[in-house]
């Protein structure tokens, strides 16, 4: 999965997919009442990027729905996965469950069209704080109560705080999550970060008894760091330059080992070599 980083304006969806992304990451900011409000990152952000592009969250969802609904004039068949980077740092810990409920209602109405031929992309809810694990239950309970438990087949989870792998496993246990887990690791492109924890996550994924199904690394903008990430065995790389990742994947060393994921590739299944 080539994951376009910080795609917060509707116009950027086409821009990143046309550069080779089959997945996008979108920031979600919340108001004081734990309502998802804007797709907005703010300052500071990655070097070389504008941090200030935004939409109202519900408007972005409608644009995303158009891009991921077959038959729509805006449909992009390659776009199969969306990571919502949930900026829950602005919330109190006791608002996490409420944020999950409200997120579920927004997605149900504006993205899934109340279960009636909505967008088809797989969704990863990425949470920065392990203490906010109740967001998951708020989300899953609400979709079930609203009569659409089948949509949970399309939803996975990520804790993005670079916490110790054991602590992340514990948070999932508390949240009652037993699958659909992506594990992120990374840092802004302005700084360097080694691959130690990525390798640990990959080992957990491949052990057959870990909690992780997929591992992605962010933010990867250079050919050398792309090669390092692929060599470490990641399933996805998040990038500001999807075309750079595409170029590396076409190199002799990688083109027979890796290919771009399609809609037929289940993002919740651990890939067996």
UniProtKB/Swiss-Prot annotation:
Positions of disulphide bridges: 45-51, 47-190
Top-level taxonomic group: Eukaryota
Sites where the protein binds Mg(2+): 25, 27, 85
Keywords from the UniProt entry: Cytolysis, Dermonecrotic toxin, Disulfide bond, Hemolysis, Lipid degradation, Lipid metabolism, Lyase, Magnesium, Metal-binding, Secreted, Toxin
UniProt protein name: Dermonecrotic toxin LspaSicTox-alphaIA2iii
E.C. numbers: 4.6.1.-
Active-site annotation: 5, 41
Reaction(s) this enzyme catalyzes, per UniProt: an N-(acyl)-sphingosylphosphocholine = an N-(acyl)-sphingosyl-1,3-cyclic phosphate + choline; an N-(acyl)-sphingosylphosphoethanolamine = an N-(acyl)-sphingosyl-1,3-cyclic phosphate + ethanolamine; a 1-acyl-sn-glycero-3-phosphocholine = a 1-acyl-sn-glycero-2,3-cyclic phosphate + choline; a 1-acyl-sn-glycero-3-phosphoethanolamine = a 1-acyl-sn-glycero-2,3-cyclic phosphate + ethanolamine
Main localization category: secreted
Phylogenetic placement of the source organism: Eukaryota, Metazoa, Ecdysozoa, Arthropoda, Chelicerata
Annotated compartments: Secreted
Entry comment describing in which tissues the protein is expressed: Expressed by the venom gland.
Cofactor: how bound: Binds 1 Mg(2+) ion per subunit.
GO terms assigned for molecular function: lyase activity; metal ion binding; phosphoric diester hydrolase activity; toxin activity
Gene3D superfamilies, alphabetized: Phosphatidylinositol (PI) phosphodiesterase
One annotated GO biological process: lipid catabolic process
Gene Ontology annotations for the cellular component aspect, listed alphabetically: extracellular region
Enzyme class: lyase
UniProt record similarity statement: Belongs to the arthropod phospholipase D family. Class II subfamily.
